Amino acid sequence: MTMGDMKTPDFDDLLAAFDIPDMVDPKAAIESGHDDHESHMKQNAHGEDDSHAPSSSDVGVSVIVKNVRNIDSSEGGEKDGHNPTGNGLHNGFLTASSLDSYSKDGAKSLKGDVPASEVTLKDSTFSQFSPISSAEEFDDDEKIEVDDPPDKEDMRSSFRSNVLTGSAPQQDYDKLKALGGENSSKTGLSTSGNVEKNKAVKRETEASSINLSVYEPFKVRKAEDKLKESSDKVLENRVLDGKLSSEKNDTSLPSVAPSKTKSSSKLSSCIAAIAALSAKKAASDSCKEPVANSRESSPLPKEVNDSPRAADKSPESQNLIDGTKKPSLKQPDSPRSISSENSSKGSPSSPAGSTPAIPKVRIKTIKTSSGEIKRTVTRVLPEVDLDSGKKPSEQTASVMASVTSLLSSPASAAVLSSPPRAPLQSAVVTNAVSPAELTPKQVTIKPVATAFLPVSAVKTAGSQVINLKLANNTTVKATVISAASVQSASSAIIKAANAIQQQTVVVPASSLANAKLVPKTVHLANLNLLPQGAQATSELRQVLTKPQQQIKQAIINAAASQPPKKVSRVQVVSSLQSSVVEAFNKVLSSVNPVPVYIPNLSPPANAGITLPTRGYKCLECGDSFALEKSLTQHYDRRSVRIEVTCNHCTKNLVFYNKCSLLSHARGHKEKGVVMQCSHLILKPVPADQMIVSPSSNTSTSTSTLQSPVGAGTHTVTKIQSGITGTVISAPSSTPITPAMPLDEDPSKLCRHSLKCLECNEVFQDETSLATHFQQAADTSGQKTCTICQMLLPNQCSYASHQRIHQHKSPYTCPECGAICRSVHFQTHVTKNCLHYTRRVGFRCVHCNVVYSDVAALKSHIQGSHCEVFYKCPICPMAFKSAPSTHSHAYTQHPGIKIGEPKIIYKCSMCDTVFTLQTLLYRHFDQHIENQKVSVFKCPDCSLLYAQKQLMMDHIKSMHGTLKSIEGPPNLGINLPLSIKPATQNSANQNKEDTKSMNGKEKLEKKSPSPVKKSMETKKVASPGWTCWECDCLFMQRDVYISHVRKEHGKQMKKHPCRQCDKSFSSSHSLCRHNRIKHKGIRKVYACSHCPDSRRTFTKRLMLEKHVQLMHGIKDPDLKEMTDATNEEETEIKEDTKVPSPKRKLEEPVLEFRPPRGAITQPLKKLKINVFKVHKCAVCGFTTENLLQFHEHIPQHKSDGSSYQCRECGLCYTSHVSLSRHLFIVHKLKEPQPVSKQNGAGEDNQQENKPSHEDESPDGAVSDRKCKVCAKTFETEAALNTHMRTHGMAFIKSKRMSSAEK
């Protein structure tokens, strides 16, 4: 399995884990099984006080270093055949469990080299799990072996038969008791009470330690005699091979007082084991001195199985020893392990180049009649180490001091423990013998942590070669391998190995010079903790990337950084249900200890604060806040540092709380994809960094609120910077619910008939009726309004929407199907059902992601779904990458210099290829045309939603009450309902869309005929906004403004011009700009007294001052001067005689810009032509002939005394009721003369005739004279403003003036 085959962790379930606690306790959040280890540690501490018996470890004559504070319990564990390990992580380095078993080819016993008088004692000490074994067990097959979990005891017990230790379980039991008694009394005498205590402690330790290797201690007692027989045979063979003399020690070992530190997490050192083992040579049968003078140097020497009982060893074991001895002679030295400072001196591969002198220990074993084993351990003077210049006791003390210095490093207790049933354990077994030696030995490094394999920490630079001289004068060269010196793996494993341990480890520089100290971190890359060095093979990656597999073996050839010939063979037996995965799962599944925060949303009445009904809610944890800023601070809070590499964003992100991380994941989920990451690290935030200033918090927080859901400045900023991005959408599994009106209708202004008036279908309730109107048909069933380009979901909604433009009854809401009266209809549609929030969106054919802009969709399809090929410039071959094309050209077209390959774009929907990206984008139009969908834009924050109900929920939760209203695209909100057919607008609009002209060129080039120039401007109307930089067309104003700001760096005001790149802050300024710049309608005043210069003035006052000052005329005749200007006269005539085209030109300018209270003058002129089609409110009769209408409505009069409305035919019993009706419905303040029978129909007909001329032909003066009060104004705008004060007199005067003409 390669890295390419790995699956990155899927965060699909991340959104559901909203109850993640923010604070990650470095000891509780990650620690799995910590309580179990605590009890284990306590028992270990008690064991230290009583005995220094060596803890249990691997079988055979091997040097095994294991970090064990557990003294008595470890001894007890050996009696029972178990292998207790230390707790967790020690000094920042991962350790592995004991070697469960050696392979049949690799395991062997060299116990035959020890005299028979010592066999009995040494057999019991070097049991299956002895932590200290003879260095003669240096095997040719260096391994890293990992203890299986306790539930694998059957496998382990089966391996036991292959372990050639020559030690029987009963012997181990007896000898452990003897050795334990000797250590506790410091005299070498054993006590049965200590043995019993060891047994009791061991039983408790078995229940608490997760790394205990369960073995049946007495299953192989019968093989005891055979194993001892084999030991004798081995001894004879080894003696024949020759005796090795220990190398002299060139340097003196300093004598350091042993430390008494009781740190629960100490890193085991090979020095202690080697020193203790070497001291055996000096032991005599009568001498009973203890080896260790410090409880910290717990790895004590154990017997070398040379007992006469070894002669009983089975032939199978002897054959296995012989078989494994031969290849071991060919193996070079392996990488080294941890050693003391001075032990590296004299080593061939160590920097000092010296070999230390190792003290000897003599162990005597006596089996009593009761079956118990008594052992005595004494130091003896070295035979060949006298020239080292130091006494053996000093050498031993210095070795022990070195070990103590390692064990007493100030790392605190381990905070990372492995899962109870699946610890990740490892051990290192290396071949430490130089090729020249006849008896290669094996050193087993047994760290006791349970997180990640520390193979990546081994370096040969820190290795040491130590000579061990046994009691039979056999000299063994042992290589000590540092657990922190392998360079074949990446630093990610080192971090994972130190999972959340933040404390650094202080160890001697020479032994741990290359150790990488890592803070508390948890890596999740599935966990992507792969060694990335070139020296590690894929088998290690396969082992380290299967978290659910408990036992996995792989053979890795890890090349050492020493001479090329020295390559060690490492075997990994690891359990990869890592504690890191367990830790993060615990974080995800744990319950948030803090209750959901609900603010007080009822401020005092005198405070004048308006709060949303539900506050501002965090969608990740459920907390609500009264202020929007509080929600922003909630997302910016610092609780835990989360570093993640998002595969979709292709960037490294840093979050400081789980809400911001889940919000980012939610953002991807709403886009139709599931968040995936390749690396995730959890780190606690230091207390001094949790509270930061807002400025620094904003700068340091890379991504605190990436999701477009929710309120806050982060959300608004994101939307404004990427308004053309995707639309917020609900998950596909969410049931579609109709969006009901925002507010209830307590006054019953609207009614629901439960019957669709378009298709006559009857529904059960209002919700079903709303679903009928909002349910989108297939793509072909959707309708687009020809007037406002709104996309309607179905035919019924489209028909009711069309009547809005036509102002025809019945006034049916296109959203909910409610029927309203005309006076309440616009309010219901705009404020309650938010009909005008509909926008046109575009759905991706491939992934169904919705975009609000067609350009964004095209870019998405081209970047995500279309293939790009690189064509060879010479031949027709094309390739998927440029390097492939270059390689092809190099091989197929040698000698020909080619340039860059030509890029070919392939359409993902029809497989058509294009050579230009612009051609591809243009081609997309034919596919996207049928992919339009409705999206909904929030009026306040401009967020876009694919479902209307989502927008409604957003408004209720985030805004409460809307501050702005999305009005109709081409009608003012407060305008009366005009009954203008949609066909006229659409026809004129289609004609106007045919041609476009540049307004700037028209201004620069003066037309000889202003009328002609004005006629040309009629063709300029555009349905949207065109970007002047890139010629992109935008149908929505805010999208156009965002595009210009984002793509071209220009700031646009709220009202951009459709015909140029100018923008204005108010609609009035935009109208004036259009009238002057693009329509050429300019009020100018020319001086008649300056015939040469023909000076003109934009204001009448300026002309008057000019005439008075320059020409000395006190009372100038303005009428004469205005008549003298041809340009002004023609402009006025054009303005008066052709008002309708002018209005039609100005209406599309405001088509997509809701006025929201700012009613511009062109729209006000619509009041003149309000009643063009007359409709009888009683029977529905319609006609455009006012005379015919007045002839029709008298038939509905009930009697001669009733008052009938001349506008709609309704009858009233009093004049007051009729006046109220005229004012409310028809916007008429002054009721017309009421006609009892026929009335003055002709006069009303004249009054209501559409006017074709707005101004009198008298010129500028009459144009600016109020026809009600005869007051004259300088500008037409001032006159229009004044006319509003007269109410209906304004409309009457207009109608009268038109009637007179």
UniProtKB/Swiss-Prot annotation:
Residues 84-101, 122-133, 158-170, 182-195 have a biased composition (Polar residues). It comes from Homo sapiens. Residues 26-206, 223-266, 281-366, 983-1017, 1230-1263 are annotated as: Disordered. Its main location: nucleus. The modification Phosphoserine is found at S130, S133, S134, S252, S307, S314, S434, S1140. The modification Phosphothreonine is found at T205. GO terms for cellular component: nucleus. Residues 136-151 have a biased composition (Acidic residues). Gene3D superfamilies: Classic Zinc Finger (3.30.160.60). Residues 32-52, 102-111, 196-206, 223-250, 303-315, 990-1017 have a biased composition (Basic and acidic residues). It is found in: Nucleus. Disulfide bonds: none annotated. This is Zinc finger protein 532. The modification N6-acetyllysine is found at K175. Keywords: Acetylation, DNA-binding, Isopeptide bond, Metal-binding, Nucleus, Phosphoprotein, Repeat, Transcription, Transcription regulation, Ubl conjugation, Zinc, Zinc-finger. May be involved in transcriptional regulation. SUPFAM superfamilies: beta-beta-alpha zinc fingers (SSF57667). Pfam families: zf-C2H2_11 (PF16622), zf-C2H2_6 (PF13912), zf-C2H2_ZNF592 (PF25412). Residues 337-359 have a biased composition (Low complexity). Belongs to the krueppel C2H2-type zinc-finger protein family. GO terms for molecular function: DNA binding; DNA-binding transcription factor activity; zinc ion binding. A zinc finger (C2H2-type) spans 616-635, 754-779, 783-805, 842-865, 870-893, 905-927, 936-959, 1025-1048, 1055-1078, 1085-1111, 1203-1226, 1264-1286. There is a cross-link at K459, K516, K980, K1144, K1167 (Glycyl lysine isopeptide (Lys-Gly) (interchain with G-Cter in SUMO2)).
